[in-house]
């Protein structure tokens, strides 16, 4: 079975959410309303049973490391059973990602005209704010995606993403380091873990070093290839 309509896997670095290649269909363009409240900050990540979001030996050819792509079987082999979670991933009105997710592991390739992993029409169809230490002009892509490069920290990126998202959610798209930064800083409202029944044995862990973060389990749902656990961040 192929990927669900509106979803395309991409070769993006470090975060399993990056590999989802979030592709939002036309039915999502209107957004959703949160009754006038400030948009939530969410993060969807697939992890192995031993807590890794990517396997060992991450490299340009295998940005999710050895075995990392297998984490995401649930999206592409059983999309119908996992439709609510896929819908949740697609709902964001703006995204934030780290430099490694945009450019991949290893030396920067921006000076070579790099425009991301996703071709001329990236799958986000919304503004994407890329955290970096290097100045870069915005990139306007086909299909509504635009990349904006933020050099003054996660708070600035979040403020800009909230403004762009309006009443829709802001999604932390990855990678793992970026997710940890937002979680540790108390800037995340929901952490949605998709736990794959596999052991990677090494690679990049998600939660190492996040500090004293309190989570409240809000929902658990299993579909065979994955167990979805939604946590609220308690402040």
Region roles according to the model:
Residues 11-15:
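Low-acidity, Ser/Thr- and Arg-rich intrinsically disordered low-complexity segments
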Residues 1-10:
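Extreme N-terminal basic, low-complexity initiation segments
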């Amino acid at each position: 079975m192929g990927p669900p309509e509106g979803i395309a896997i991409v070769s993006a670095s470090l975060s399993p959410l990056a590999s989802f290649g979030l592709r939002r269909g036309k039915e999502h363009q209107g957004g959703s309303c949160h009754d006038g409240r400030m948009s939530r900050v969410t993060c969807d990540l697939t992890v192995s049973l031993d807590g890794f979001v990517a396997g060992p030996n991450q490299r340009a050819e295998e940005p999710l490391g050895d075995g990392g792509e297998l984490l995401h079987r649930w999206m592409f082999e059983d999309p119908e059973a996992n439709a609510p979670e896929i819908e949740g991933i697609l709902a964001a009105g703006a995204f934030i990602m780290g430099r490694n997710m945009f450019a991949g592991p290893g030396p920067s390739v921006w000076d070579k005209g790099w425009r991301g992993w996703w071709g001329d029409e990236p799958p986000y169809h919304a503004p994407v704010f890329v955290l970096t230490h290097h100045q870069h002009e915005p990139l306007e892509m086909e299909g509504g995606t635009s990349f904006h490069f933020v050099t003054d920290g996660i708070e600035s990126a979040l403020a800009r993403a909230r403004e762009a998202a309006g009443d829709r959610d802001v999604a932390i798209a990855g990678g793992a380091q970026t997710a940890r930064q937002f979680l540790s800083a108390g800037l995340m409202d929901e952490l949605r873990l998709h736990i794959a029944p596999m052991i990677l044995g090494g690679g990049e862990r998600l939660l190492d070093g996040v500090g004293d973060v309190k989570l409240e389990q809000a929902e658990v749902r299993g579909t065979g290839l994955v167990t979805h656990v939604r946590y609220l961040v308690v402040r």
